[in-house]
């Protein structure tokens, strides 16, 4: 199982990933696959309406995401990718809950990821491109098994915790993008959660 579950919801510090740098990452397949996904998405980014990050903190958006998660079952049909429903839920738990203290994740950030990648993937793009492979701490091994009911209830808890995080002090740094504003967190979570729920027709 990826990540260590912790019950508290206060922000946690990222563990240091020694040697993480652009020079190191540029030789990995994950870096190039993610770069290809970004380039392929650019034309669509000009046609899709931008996402208001602060909408994440509204009652309407909170209820929408909770209802979509609540209605998800192990039988939901996969639309793309290779993850199972339980693996997808665990992936979202890591991605959404790490910076609220539910998990301890490695710091994989470097200058380019905290500036250029953050601007492209958070501030510019209105959707998550298909095929991103970063950060590695969010990746789920194909053979990993997770308890569907636990992961579902965990995600509902994390949705509540993130919805209540209304100041920058409530958030720890993102493993790839570093410290972010409340609005940036709201936008990133909206597009990431929506992407993976649509992945399973939820």
Locations of regions flagged by a protein language model:
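N-terminal export leaders
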Residues: 16-17, 23-32, 38
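Short, helix-capping/interhelical loops that line the mouth of catalytic, cofactor-
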Residues: 35-54, 102-154
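An N-terminal domain-cap segment
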Residues: 53-82
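Short, contiguous alpha-helical
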Residues: 75-123, 164, 171-202
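A non-catalytic, amphipathic alpha-helix used as a structural packing/dimerization or gating element
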Residues: 150, 154-157, 191, 195
